Design a protein with these regions (language model features):
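Glycine-rich FAD pyrophosphate-binding loop
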Residues: 21-40
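Helical element adjacent to the flavin cofactor pocket in flavoenzyme catalytic cores
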Residues: 136-175, 186, 190
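N-terminal Rossmann-like FAD-binding beta1-loop-alpha1 element of flavoenzymes
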Residues: 2-27
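Conserved FAD/dinucleotide-binding core of flavoprotein oxidoreductases
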Residues: 213-216, 223, 237-313
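Dinucleotide-binding Rossmann-like beta1-alpha1 core, especially the glycine-rich loop
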Residues: 43-122, 131
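C-terminal catalytic lobe of FAD-dependent flavoproteins
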Residues: 271, 279-285, 291-376
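Short beta-strand to alpha-helix junction loop
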Residues: 57-58, 85-94, 135-154, 299-304, ...
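Central helical "cap/lid" subdomain
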Residues: 185-252
Length: 376
């Protein structure tokens, strides 16, 4: 079967891989000379812990596929795990409730509550001032998104003969056919549209009335940390407990959310929660904020970065905070589920809306999709 894919972000690559592994003849079209969207602008966190319980097996499948892809394609991956640091009693309480809730589940073997000194022995990146303890999880991985996503096409071509057409915009897609900007027609049996936050070019009518919108995030990266300093696991803190759905069932979360809303309403307004990951070059990637829909402006205002840094300093210690880069990314966020997957014409499927989970879930979701979709 001939499969055409629009977009060489992580979603498009995931579909290309899953389709090619099933023996299909795959062609990927990407309008930019190299992937430059959300997939290369993120933390590189394979954030299994942030996923709701019903997504754990898909997230773990994704994680395994990342490790496999890294070996095959030759990019860096670290099974670094993660720590949620607690600097307030309510944060510690939420973490304790989360562990208690998962005591009888498969997740239990991956989780451990650490006291203050155990936490400090796991990372020298935790700010010891007011540190109460942390939640350790061993399931998270780290990749450098830019090098990982940009190295996968060569590997997929080498290993599975996937064809990539970069600098090639798809201007029209319909059953059996893709038309590109140079007027060429390409014939396919199945087409998967992984065009990220571009809701305007292909099937714009499909997005009308659907709870999907763009979300803009501010990000920063430090210079290489001195003397080979390593952060160890990914670090997150109390603000993150409000962000991912996994902590929703914890009874103390509402009180924590209320405290933060009262103490610092701008954090809710700007969707700020803070996290840090460290790439293979020793640089620490820092973020982030969330502005949705009509709030998305092309201008990056420095006050957002200042708020992010102020919160990071409260929970994280770094040998140097000197910044090497600032940027923003935009992803498509679908709020009625973790991905927007819709057949828009016979044999043509739109697959986007992964929000802040695309790096974590794309490989697993694409596998799941191809096992459901087959045979045509
Ligand atoms: C700042 C930031 C931090 C994040 N951190 C994490 C994280 O740590 N962990 C995690 O799991 N997720 C994270 N995410 C989310 C994750 O990055 C996204 O969910 C994911 O990258 C979306 O992938 P995508 O392939 O759908 O979109 P994209 O990466 O945007 O790719 C879409 C591609 O389609 C191409 N395209 C669009 N239209 C056409 C067309 N007509 N013809 C040809 N090509 C076209 C675009 O050029 C683009 O390359 C983060 C996102 C951001 C922005």
């Amino acid at each position: 079967m001939r499969v055409g894919i629009v977009g060489a972000g992580i979603a498009g690559l995931a579909h290309a891989w899953s389709a090619a592994q099933r023996g299909h003849e795959v062609t990927v079209f990407e309008r930019t000379p190299k992937a430059s969207g959300a997939s290369i602008r993120n933390f590189g966190m394979i954030w299994v812990i942030g996923q709701p319980d019903h997504m754990q097996s898909i997230a773990m499948d994704s994680r395994d596929r990342w490790i496999h892809a890294a070996k095959q394609a030759g990019f860096w991956v670290s099974p670094c795990g993660s720590l949620h640091l607690a600097h307030h009693d309510d944060e510690w309480q939420v973490l304790s409730e989360y562990v208690a809730e998962h005591g009888q589940t498969q997740r239990a073997e991956h989780l451990q509550l650490l006291d203050r000194s155990e936490t400090l022995s796991r990372t020298s990146g935790a700010n010891p001032d007011g540190l109460r303890g942390s939640l350790w999880s061993d399931t998270e991985c780290c990749v450098d998104p830019t090098s990982a996503v940009r190295s996968m096409p060569a590997w997929l071509h080498r290993q599975y003969q996937v064809e990539f057409h970069f600098s090639t915009a798809v201007t029209q897609a319909q059953t059996g056919l893709i038309r590109t900007g140079d007027g060429t027609h390409h014939r396919f049996d199945r087409i998967v549209i992984c065009s990220g936050d571009d809701f305007a070019t292909l099937f714009p009518e499909v997005y009308n009335g659907i709870p999907i919108r763009p979300c803009k995030l501010h990000m920063m990266r430090t210079v290489e940390q001195p003397q080979g300093w390593r952060i160890g696991p990914h670090l997150a803190g109390g603000l993150t407990l409000r962000h991912y759905p996994n902590f929703k069932k914890c009874p103390t979360l509402a009180a924590l959310q209320q405290r933060i809303a009262q103490e610092s309403p701008h954090l809710d307004r700007l969707g700020i929660h803070v996290m840090a990951s460290q790439n293979h070059l020793g640089q620490v990637v820092l973020g982030d904020s969330h502005q949705y829909g009509d709030e998305v402006e092309p201008f990056d205002t420095s006050d957002i970065d200042e708020h992010i840094l102020k919160e990071l300093v409260k929970i994280i210690h770094l040998p140097t905070w000197q910044l090497q880069a600032r940027w923003h990314g935009v992803y498509a966020k679908y709020t009625d589920g973790l991905v927007f997957e819709q057949v828009v014409a016979p044999g043509v499927i739109v697959f986007t809306g992964l929000g802040g989970n695309g790096m974590t879930l794309s490989f697993g979701l694409a596998e799941d999709a191809w096992s459901r979709w087959e045979p045509l």
